[in-house]
């Protein structure tokens, strides 16, 4: 009964979502990526097209004035002409961003979340540490291996001096 209701709800949501996606497609204008596009990149300093594509009347007049001598242009007009062609200067492109703070913050968040998860697992999931990890047990096991003379040529027992009952130096 519950599974049937869940599947019907999921089915209705899937159908309504796909209808919304199909209805939404007619509103959005798709971009033609075969045409040249404007990009601000340091390694590609001259983009294929200008930043401003549709010029206003004052911008068209400024473009006509550009064809004459550049010494007659003011500094502001030269800057405006530059801004018609480029969105950012090299200084603006090279300016550091604060994106590193977001990256470091996200990394610290995930490291902290992982640490909390490990603490929770150690407390609630894992059982007690086996008795074979205790120092007393390890000492007994080492003594047993030495008594059995395990790997006497190059291994464990080769490093033990049986006459002095100590490790060789």
Swiss-Prot record:
Ranges in the topological domain labelled Mitochondrial intermembrane: 125-169
Phosphoserine found at: 56, 58
Alphabetical list of PANTHER family matching this protein: CYTOCHROME C OXIDASE SUBUNIT 4 ISOFORM 1, MITOCHONDRIAL, CYTOCHROME C OXIDASE SUBUNIT IV
Cellular-component GO terms for this entry: mitochondrial inner membrane; respiratory chain complex IV
Gene from which this protein is expressed: COX4I1
Role played: Component of the cytochrome c oxidase, the last enzyme in the mitochondrial electron transport chain which drives oxidative phosphorylation. The respiratory chain contains 3 multisubunit complexes succinate dehydrogenase (complex II, CII), ubiquinol-cytochrome c oxidoreductase (cytochrome b-c1 complex, complex III, CIII) and cytochrome c oxidase (complex IV, CIV), that cooperate to transfer electrons derived from NADH and succinate to molecular oxygen, creating an electrochemical gradient over the inner membrane that drives transmembrane transport and the ATP synthase.
Family stated for the protein in its record: Belongs to the cytochrome c oxidase IV family.
Cross-referenced InterPro entries: Cyt_c_oxidase_su4 (IPR013288), Cyt_c_oxidase_su4_fam (IPR004203), Cyt_c_oxidase_su4_sf (IPR036639)
GO biological process: mitochondrial electron transport, cytochrome c to oxygen
Taxonomic placement: Eukaryota, Metazoa, Chordata, Craniata, Vertebrata
Transit peptide extent on chain: 1-22
Protein name in UniProt: Cytochrome c oxidase subunit 4 isoform 1, mitochondrial
């Amino acid at each position: 009964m519950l599974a049937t209701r869940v599947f019907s709800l999921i089915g209705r949501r899937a159908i309504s979502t796909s209808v919304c996606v199909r209805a939404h497609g007619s509103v959005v204008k798709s971009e033609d990526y075969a045409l040249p596009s404007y990009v601000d990149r340091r390694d590609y300093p001259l983009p294929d097209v200008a930043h401003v594509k549709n010029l206003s009347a004052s911008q068209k007049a400024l473009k006509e004035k550009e064809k004459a001598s550049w010494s007659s242009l003011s500094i502001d007009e030269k800057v405006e002409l530059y801004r018609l062609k480029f969105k950012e200067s090299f200084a603006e492109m090279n300016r550091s961003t604060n994106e590193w703070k977001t990256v470091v913050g996200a990394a610290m968040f995930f490291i902290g979340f992982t640490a909390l998860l490990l603490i929770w697992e150690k407390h609630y999931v894992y059982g007690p540490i086996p008795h074979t990890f205790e120092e007393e047990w390890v000492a007994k096991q080492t003594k047993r291996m030495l008594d059995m003379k395990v790997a006497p040529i190059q291994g464990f027992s080769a490093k033990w001096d049986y006459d002095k009952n100590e490790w060789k130096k």
